[in-house]
A protein has these predicted regions:
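A shared catalytic/ligand-binding motif for oxyanion handling
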Residues: 1-230
Length: 230
């Protein structure tokens, strides 16, 4: 099983839909979680043969917007729950004959809304009754090593780490480089804003799972490629 999590800023840019379609094909993706604005026309260009079941949360102004898709031949969608910052799908995995959850998140870039996002994150994860992964652009750093410049202490960082510990989630190690986002300046700021977390019982389903950072294309975030290691 393979999946992609990516904040593809500028999804409406020329060539972005073609790029996404190529990523799905080249990496034989079974699920995707994407961020930014999308239109039905864009989705048709990404998935011209209708191989995926798509769900989305519309963008609000210049921010927000989540698109999540799973292949019809691999998964059956049991339920879908849409919050302000999180799109939660519970699927039946036809290959392993188990149910599990895919939560795609897009945390607020504004400090004043980060607690609201974290409350939603804690609530949705706490209510999961099946194994699950939660991934996306959290827009929160976990520690000072996740930024190439000086970082001020943050209440949201403390709350985020507390939630991860309370829920016994584990971050899947990302190979290919430490940082996932850049501001593309002459002396760039580099940060790790994107990540994928898993519950203990999801790791038991896929003990060989790993995540690899792909080359940055048409966005200031790198795509994250998850593989079950099978």
């Amino acid at each position: 099983m393979r999946g992609l999590i990516w904040n593809c800023r500028g999804a409406g840019k020329k060539g972005m839909a073609t790029c996404l379609s190529a990523l799905i094909s080249d990496h034989s993706l079974d699920f995707v979680g994407l961020h930014k604005k999308f239109s039905p026309k864009c989705i048709r260009r990404i998935d011209p043969f209708g191989l995926f079941h798509w769900e989305w949360i519309p963008s609000a102004g210049k921010s927000g917007g989540i698109l999540s898709g799973v292949r019809h031949d691999i998964f059956y969608v049991i339920s879908c729950n849409k919050g302000k910052y999180i799109l939660q799908m519970v699927v039946h995995d036809k290959k392993i004959k188990k149910d599990w959850g895919l939560l795609v998140v897009y945390g607020s870039t504004h400090e004043e809304f980060k607690e609201e996002f974290l409350v939603e994150l804690a609530a949705m994860c706490s209510n999961m009754s099946v194994p699950y992964i939660v991934g996306g652009d959290f827009n929160i750093l976990r520690n000072c090593n996740e930024k190439n410049k000086m970082m001020n202490s943050s209440r949201s960082t403390d709350i985020f780490n507390s939630i991860i510990n309370a829920l016994a989630l584990r971050e899947i190690y990302t190979s290919g480089g430490k940082y996932i986002w850049t501001n593309n300046q002459a002396h760039p700021t580099l940060e790790k804003l994107d990540r994928i977390l898993m519950s203990e019982d999801w790791e038991n389903l896929f003990p060989m799972v790993y995540v690899r950072k792909l080359v940055q294309e048409l966005s200031d975030h790198n795509p994250l490629l998850l593989s079950s290691g099978e």
